Amino acid sequence: MKNHIYIHIPFCESKCPYCAFGSFSDKFGLIARYFDALYKEINRANLGEISSVFIGGGTPSVVKADFYEPIFEILRPNLDKNAEITIEINPGTINKSKLEKYKEAGINRISIGLQSSKINLLKEIGRIHTYEDFEDTVKLAKEVGFTNINVDIMIGIPNQTIYDVEDTLDKILALDLTHISVYSLIYEDGTLMTKMIDDGNLDEVDEEIERYMYWYAKRRLEDNGFIHYEISNFAKPSYRCKHNLGCWSQKEYLGFGVAAASYIDNFRMKNTDSLEKYINNINNDKFYKNLTIEEKQTIDDQMKEFVILRLRMMEGFRASDFTAKFNKDVYKVFENQIGKLLEEDLIFAEEFGYLRLTKKGLDLANIVWGEFI
Protein backbone atom coordinates (compact mmCIF):
# COMPACT_ATOMS: atom_id res chain seq x y z
CA MET A 1 0.00 0.00 0.00
CA LYS A 2 1.25 3.46 -0.88
CA ASN A 3 1.41 6.04 1.88
CA HIS A 4 1.04 9.78 1.96
CA ILE A 5 3.34 11.76 4.26
CA TYR A 6 2.64 15.05 6.02
CA ILE A 7 5.46 16.93 7.78
CA HIS A 8 4.61 19.88 10.01
CA ILE A 9 6.95 22.85 10.36
CA PRO A 10 5.41 25.03 13.09
CA PHE A 11 7.49 28.20 12.83
CA CYS A 12 6.17 31.54 11.56
CA GLU A 13 7.52 35.08 11.54
CA SER A 14 4.15 36.19 12.88
CA LYS A 15 0.88 34.45 13.73
CA CYS A 16 -1.93 35.40 11.35
CA PRO A 17 -5.06 36.41 13.31
CA TYR A 18 -7.25 33.83 11.49
CA CYS A 19 -4.84 30.90 11.86
CA ALA A 20 -5.83 27.94 14.03
CA PHE A 21 -2.94 25.67 12.99
CA GLY A 22 -0.13 24.77 15.37
CA SER A 23 2.42 27.52 14.79
CA PHE A 24 4.80 29.63 16.85
CA SER A 25 6.41 33.00 16.15
CA ASP A 26 8.38 33.15 19.41
CA LYS A 27 10.27 29.83 19.46
CA PHE A 28 12.88 30.17 16.73
CA GLY A 29 15.53 29.16 19.26
CA LEU A 30 14.12 25.63 19.13
CA ILE A 31 14.37 25.16 15.35
CA ALA A 32 17.54 23.03 15.35
CA ARG A 33 16.31 20.85 18.23
CA TYR A 34 12.94 20.47 16.55
CA PHE A 35 14.43 19.21 13.30
CA ASP A 36 16.70 16.78 15.16
CA ALA A 37 13.60 15.34 16.83
CA LEU A 38 11.74 15.31 13.51
CA TYR A 39 14.54 13.31 11.83
CA LYS A 40 14.36 10.74 14.65
CA GLU A 41 10.57 10.44 14.41
CA ILE A 42 10.64 9.91 10.64
CA ASN A 43 13.60 7.54 10.80
CA ARG A 44 11.87 5.12 13.18
CA ALA A 45 8.63 4.96 11.17
CA ASN A 46 7.54 2.15 8.88
CA LEU A 47 7.25 4.35 5.79
CA GLY A 48 6.27 1.89 3.09
CA GLU A 49 6.13 3.15 -0.47
CA ILE A 50 5.51 6.90 -0.48
CA SER A 51 3.13 8.40 -3.04
CA SER A 52 3.23 12.00 -1.81
CA VAL A 53 4.94 14.25 0.71
CA PHE A 54 3.44 17.52 1.90
CA ILE A 55 5.52 19.89 4.05
CA GLY A 56 3.15 22.36 5.68
CA GLY A 57 2.98 24.70 8.59
CA GLY A 58 3.40 27.18 9.95
CA THR A 59 5.72 28.60 7.35
CA PRO A 60 8.18 25.93 6.15
CA SER A 61 10.11 28.51 4.10
CA VAL A 62 10.98 30.57 7.19
CA VAL A 63 13.70 28.10 8.25
CA LYS A 64 17.00 27.42 6.51
CA ALA A 65 16.63 25.16 3.48
CA ASP A 66 19.51 22.99 4.72
CA PHE A 67 17.21 21.50 7.36
CA TYR A 68 15.25 19.64 4.65
CA GLU A 69 17.94 17.54 2.99
CA PRO A 70 18.29 15.13 5.97
CA ILE A 71 14.53 14.50 5.78
CA PHE A 72 14.84 13.42 2.16
CA GLU A 73 17.88 11.29 2.90
CA ILE A 74 15.51 9.25 5.07
CA LEU A 75 12.52 9.33 2.70
CA ARG A 76 14.30 8.93 -0.64
CA PRO A 77 14.64 5.10 -0.68
CA ASN A 78 10.86 4.81 -0.20
CA LEU A 79 9.70 7.45 -2.66
CA ASP A 80 7.66 6.31 -5.63
CA LYS A 81 9.32 7.46 -8.87
CA ASN A 82 6.31 9.69 -9.57
CA ALA A 83 5.90 10.95 -6.01
CA GLU A 84 4.49 14.44 -5.60
CA ILE A 85 6.55 16.42 -3.07
CA THR A 86 5.11 19.76 -1.98
CA ILE A 87 6.39 22.50 0.29
CA GLU A 88 4.35 25.48 1.43
CA ILE A 89 6.13 28.81 1.13
CA ASN A 90 5.18 32.37 1.92
CA PRO A 91 6.34 35.41 -0.06
CA GLY A 92 8.81 37.46 1.93
CA THR A 93 10.45 34.36 3.43
CA ILE A 94 11.99 32.92 0.27
CA ASN A 95 14.97 33.50 -1.99
CA LYS A 96 16.53 31.81 -5.00
CA SER A 97 19.05 29.86 -2.93
CA LYS A 98 16.29 28.26 -0.83
CA LEU A 99 14.33 27.33 -3.94
CA GLU A 100 17.41 25.77 -5.54
CA LYS A 101 18.02 23.67 -2.43
CA TYR A 102 14.38 22.55 -2.38
CA LYS A 103 14.73 21.44 -6.00
CA GLU A 104 17.99 19.61 -5.30
CA ALA A 105 16.38 17.79 -2.37
CA GLY A 106 13.66 16.47 -4.68
CA ILE A 107 10.77 18.83 -3.97
CA ASN A 108 8.77 19.18 -7.20
CA ARG A 109 5.73 21.23 -6.19
CA ILE A 110 5.43 24.49 -4.30
CA SER A 111 2.35 26.03 -2.76
CA ILE A 112 2.46 29.79 -2.23
CA GLY A 113 0.23 31.60 0.25
CA LEU A 114 -0.82 34.82 -1.48
CA GLN A 115 -4.43 35.24 -0.20
CA SER A 116 -4.98 38.60 -1.97
CA SER A 117 -3.30 41.06 -4.30
CA LYS A 118 -4.54 44.02 -2.24
CA ILE A 119 -2.20 45.38 0.42
CA ASN A 120 -5.00 46.64 2.67
CA LEU A 121 -6.52 43.14 2.80
CA LEU A 122 -3.15 41.50 3.40
CA LYS A 123 -2.69 43.79 6.39
CA GLU A 124 -6.23 43.00 7.56
CA ILE A 125 -5.33 39.31 7.87
CA GLY A 126 -1.84 39.86 9.25
CA ARG A 127 0.21 38.89 6.20
CA ILE A 128 3.76 40.23 6.08
CA HIS A 129 4.20 40.34 2.30
CA THR A 130 3.00 42.32 -0.71
CA TYR A 131 1.68 41.16 -4.07
CA GLU A 132 5.02 42.18 -5.58
CA ASP A 133 6.78 39.78 -3.19
CA PHE A 134 4.49 37.01 -4.43
CA GLU A 135 5.15 37.82 -8.09
CA ASP A 136 8.90 37.81 -7.44
CA THR A 137 8.57 34.41 -5.73
CA VAL A 138 6.77 32.92 -8.74
CA LYS A 139 9.41 34.27 -11.13
CA LEU A 140 12.23 32.85 -9.02
CA ALA A 141 10.50 29.48 -8.75
CA LYS A 142 10.15 29.27 -12.51
CA GLU A 143 13.78 30.30 -13.02
CA VAL A 144 14.87 27.46 -10.73
CA GLY A 145 12.75 25.01 -12.73
CA PHE A 146 9.54 24.52 -10.77
CA THR A 147 6.65 23.84 -13.13
CA ASN A 148 4.02 22.70 -10.62
CA ILE A 149 3.02 25.80 -8.65
CA ASN A 150 -0.09 26.33 -6.53
CA VAL A 151 -1.33 29.62 -5.13
CA ASP A 152 -3.78 30.00 -2.27
CA ILE A 153 -6.24 32.87 -2.43
CA MET A 154 -8.89 33.82 0.09
CA ILE A 155 -12.42 35.15 -0.22
CA GLY A 156 -14.65 36.60 2.47
CA ILE A 157 -11.94 38.76 4.03
CA PRO A 158 -13.41 41.67 6.03
CA ASN A 159 -13.74 44.74 3.77
CA GLN A 160 -13.02 42.67 0.64
CA THR A 161 -15.04 43.51 -2.47
CA ILE A 162 -15.73 41.61 -5.67
CA TYR A 163 -13.42 44.07 -7.41
CA ASP A 164 -10.60 42.99 -5.09
CA VAL A 165 -11.21 39.36 -6.06
CA GLU A 166 -11.25 40.37 -9.72
CA ASP A 167 -7.91 42.15 -9.34
CA THR A 168 -6.34 39.13 -7.63
CA LEU A 169 -7.56 36.74 -10.32
CA ASP A 170 -6.49 39.06 -13.15
CA LYS A 171 -2.97 39.11 -11.78
CA ILE A 172 -2.49 35.45 -10.93
CA LEU A 173 -4.03 34.24 -14.19
CA ALA A 174 -1.37 36.21 -16.04
CA LEU A 175 1.36 34.15 -14.31
CA ASP A 176 0.49 30.79 -15.94
CA LEU A 177 0.21 28.72 -12.75
CA THR A 178 -0.92 25.09 -12.62
CA HIS A 179 -3.11 25.01 -9.50
CA ILE A 180 -5.21 27.56 -7.62
CA SER A 181 -6.96 27.04 -4.28
CA VAL A 182 -9.82 29.38 -3.37
CA TYR A 183 -10.60 29.29 0.34
CA SER A 184 -13.32 31.07 2.26
CA LEU A 185 -12.06 32.76 5.41
CA ILE A 186 -13.24 30.68 8.35
CA TYR A 187 -13.43 32.11 11.84
CA GLU A 188 -11.99 29.35 14.00
CA ASP A 189 -12.50 29.20 17.75
CA GLY A 190 -9.60 30.62 19.73
CA THR A 191 -8.21 32.86 17.00
CA LEU A 192 -7.70 36.60 17.33
CA MET A 193 -9.95 37.33 14.38
CA THR A 194 -12.84 35.38 15.90
CA LYS A 195 -12.42 37.34 19.13
CA MET A 196 -12.54 40.59 17.16
CA ILE A 197 -15.79 39.46 15.53
CA ASP A 198 -17.26 38.42 18.88
CA ASP A 199 -16.23 41.74 20.48
CA GLY A 200 -17.85 43.72 17.68
CA ASN A 201 -14.54 45.14 16.44
CA LEU A 202 -14.71 43.49 13.02
CA ASP A 203 -17.55 42.82 10.58
CA GLU A 204 -17.85 39.62 8.57
CA VAL A 205 -18.44 39.83 4.84
CA ASP A 206 -22.09 39.25 4.00
CA GLU A 207 -22.62 35.57 3.14
CA GLU A 208 -24.37 36.40 -0.13
CA ILE A 209 -21.42 38.54 -1.23
CA GLU A 210 -18.94 35.83 -0.22
CA ARG A 211 -20.86 33.28 -2.31
CA TYR A 212 -20.86 35.67 -5.27
CA MET A 213 -17.08 35.92 -4.92
CA TYR A 214 -16.84 32.12 -4.99
CA TRP A 215 -18.94 31.68 -8.13
CA TYR A 216 -17.15 34.53 -9.84
CA ALA A 217 -13.78 32.91 -9.10
CA LYS A 218 -15.07 29.53 -10.29
CA ARG A 219 -16.25 30.96 -13.60
CA ARG A 220 -13.04 32.91 -14.22
CA LEU A 221 -10.82 29.95 -13.48
CA GLU A 222 -12.82 27.50 -15.59
CA ASP A 223 -12.86 30.00 -18.45
CA ASN A 224 -9.06 29.99 -18.27
CA GLY A 225 -8.59 26.23 -18.55
CA PHE A 226 -8.71 25.20 -14.89
CA ILE A 227 -10.65 22.10 -13.87
CA HIS A 228 -12.75 22.54 -10.74
CA TYR A 229 -12.12 19.16 -9.11
CA GLU A 230 -12.81 19.81 -5.40
CA ILE A 231 -14.88 22.42 -3.60
CA SER A 232 -11.92 24.78 -3.10
CA ASN A 233 -9.43 23.52 -5.68
CA PHE A 234 -8.82 24.16 -9.37
CA ALA A 235 -6.10 22.60 -11.51
CA LYS A 236 -4.81 22.59 -15.03
CA PRO A 237 -5.10 19.12 -16.64
CA SER A 238 -2.73 16.60 -14.96
CA TYR A 239 -1.96 18.94 -12.05
CA ARG A 240 -4.49 17.87 -9.43
CA CYS A 241 -2.89 17.64 -5.98
CA LYS A 242 -2.07 13.96 -5.38
CA HIS A 243 -1.64 14.44 -1.65
CA ASN A 244 -5.06 15.97 -1.12
CA LEU A 245 -6.68 13.45 -3.45
CA GLY A 246 -5.24 10.72 -1.26
CA CYS A 247 -6.71 12.24 1.90
CA TRP A 248 -10.12 12.78 0.27
CA SER A 249 -10.08 9.15 -0.90
CA GLN A 250 -9.48 7.84 2.66
CA LYS A 251 -5.95 6.71 1.87
CA GLU A 252 -3.64 6.22 4.83
CA TYR A 253 -1.25 9.01 5.72
CA LEU A 254 1.53 9.45 8.25
CA GLY A 255 1.98 12.76 10.03
CA PHE A 256 5.31 13.83 11.47
CA GLY A 257 6.06 16.78 13.72
CA VAL A 258 4.26 18.66 16.43
CA ALA A 259 0.44 18.67 16.08
CA ALA A 260 0.64 16.42 12.98
CA ALA A 261 -2.24 14.02 12.37
CA SER A 262 -2.09 10.46 11.01
CA TYR A 263 -4.66 8.04 9.64
CA ILE A 264 -3.56 4.40 9.85
CA ASP A 265 -5.65 1.22 9.84
CA ASN A 266 -8.80 3.27 10.54
CA PHE A 267 -7.23 4.97 13.57
CA ARG A 268 -7.00 8.76 13.66
CA MET A 269 -4.04 9.91 15.72
CA LYS A 270 -2.43 13.23 16.53
CA ASN A 271 0.88 14.36 17.96
CA THR A 272 1.06 16.70 20.93
CA ASP A 273 0.50 20.42 20.33
CA SER A 274 3.36 21.28 22.70
CA LEU A 275 6.64 21.97 20.92
CA GLU A 276 8.70 21.37 24.05
CA LYS A 277 6.93 18.10 24.91
CA TYR A 278 7.35 16.87 21.34
CA ILE A 279 11.10 17.48 21.40
CA ASN A 280 11.71 16.17 24.92
CA ASN A 281 9.68 12.99 24.49
CA ILE A 282 11.56 12.05 21.34
CA ASN A 283 14.95 12.86 22.87
CA ASN A 284 14.03 10.60 25.80
CA ASP A 285 12.90 7.80 23.45
CA LYS A 286 9.31 8.19 24.61
CA PHE A 287 7.77 8.61 21.17
CA TYR A 288 4.49 7.09 22.34
CA LYS A 289 3.92 9.97 24.77
CA ASN A 290 3.55 12.38 21.85
CA LEU A 291 0.71 10.45 20.26
CA THR A 292 -2.98 10.51 21.13
CA ILE A 293 -5.51 8.19 19.49
CA GLU A 294 -8.41 10.50 18.71
CA GLU A 295 -10.71 7.99 17.05
CA LYS A 296 -10.98 4.33 16.11
CA GLN A 297 -13.35 4.42 13.18
CA THR A 298 -16.17 1.91 13.05
CA ILE A 299 -17.57 0.74 9.72
CA ASP A 300 -20.38 3.26 10.18
CA ASP A 301 -17.82 6.03 10.69
CA GLN A 302 -15.94 4.96 7.57
CA MET A 303 -19.10 4.90 5.46
CA LYS A 304 -20.18 8.35 6.61
CA GLU A 305 -16.73 9.77 5.99
CA PHE A 306 -16.60 8.15 2.56
CA VAL A 307 -19.75 10.03 1.52
CA ILE A 308 -18.62 13.36 3.02
CA LEU A 309 -15.14 13.27 1.50
CA ARG A 310 -16.25 12.02 -1.91
CA LEU A 311 -18.94 14.68 -2.15
CA ARG A 312 -16.20 17.27 -1.69
CA MET A 313 -15.02 16.16 -5.11
CA MET A 314 -16.84 17.75 -8.02
CA GLU A 315 -17.23 14.39 -9.75
CA GLY A 316 -18.84 12.96 -6.62
CA PHE A 317 -18.88 9.19 -6.40
CA ARG A 318 -20.57 6.18 -7.93
CA ALA A 319 -22.84 4.02 -5.84
CA SER A 320 -20.82 1.07 -7.14
CA ASP A 321 -17.64 2.56 -5.58
CA PHE A 322 -19.35 2.53 -2.19
CA THR A 323 -20.49 -1.06 -2.72
CA ALA A 324 -17.00 -2.15 -3.79
CA LYS A 325 -15.49 -0.73 -0.60
CA PHE A 326 -18.14 -1.69 1.96
CA ASN A 327 -20.19 -4.44 0.27
CA LYS A 328 -23.32 -2.40 0.98
CA ASP A 329 -25.77 -0.31 -1.04
CA VAL A 330 -25.32 3.39 -0.26
CA TYR A 331 -28.98 4.03 -1.08
CA LYS A 332 -30.03 1.57 1.62
CA VAL A 333 -27.44 2.56 4.23
CA PHE A 334 -28.27 6.26 3.91
CA GLU A 335 -31.78 6.00 2.52
CA ASN A 336 -33.21 8.82 4.65
CA GLN A 337 -30.27 11.20 4.22
CA ILE A 338 -29.97 10.76 0.46
CA GLY A 339 -33.72 11.01 -0.02
CA LYS A 340 -33.85 14.26 1.95
CA LEU A 341 -30.86 15.79 0.14
CA LEU A 342 -32.26 14.83 -3.28
CA GLU A 343 -35.63 16.33 -2.37
CA GLU A 344 -33.99 19.56 -1.19
CA ASP A 345 -31.89 19.77 -4.39
CA LEU A 346 -28.60 19.63 -2.48
CA ILE A 347 -27.34 16.57 -4.35
CA PHE A 348 -28.34 14.92 -7.60
CA ALA A 349 -28.02 11.43 -9.05
CA GLU A 350 -26.69 11.08 -12.60
CA GLU A 351 -27.77 8.38 -15.01
CA PHE A 352 -24.35 6.69 -14.76
CA GLY A 353 -24.73 6.24 -11.02
CA TYR A 354 -22.81 9.25 -9.74
CA LEU A 355 -24.00 11.24 -6.72
CA ARG A 356 -22.81 14.85 -6.71
CA LEU A 357 -23.44 18.17 -5.05
CA THR A 358 -25.74 20.55 -6.91
CA LYS A 359 -24.99 24.25 -7.25
CA LYS A 360 -27.18 24.81 -4.21
CA GLY A 361 -25.33 21.98 -2.47
CA LEU A 362 -22.00 23.67 -3.08
CA ASP A 363 -23.25 26.76 -1.28
CA LEU A 364 -24.79 24.74 1.55
CA ALA A 365 -22.17 21.99 1.81
CA ASN A 366 -22.06 22.16 5.61
CA ILE A 367 -25.75 21.23 5.69
CA VAL A 368 -24.99 18.24 3.45
CA TRP A 369 -22.12 17.10 5.71
CA GLY A 370 -24.37 17.54 8.73
CA GLU A 371 -26.66 14.79 7.48
CA PHE A 372 -23.79 12.30 7.81
CA ILE A 373 -22.26 13.40 11.11
Predicted regions: what is each one?
Residues 1-9:
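Immediate flanking context of iron-sulfur cluster ligation sites
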Residues 328-342:
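Short amphipathic alpha-helical interaction segments
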Residues 2, 20, 24-44, 49-328:
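C-terminal scaffold of the Radical SAM
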Residues 360-373:
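Short, amphipathic alpha-helical interaction segments positioned at domain boundaries
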Residues 10-21:
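Local cysteine-cluster metal-coordination motifs and their immediate loop/turn environment
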Residues 342-352:
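A short, conserved structural fragment
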Residues 234, 351-355:
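Short, Lys/Arg-rich nucleic-acid/phosphate-binding segment
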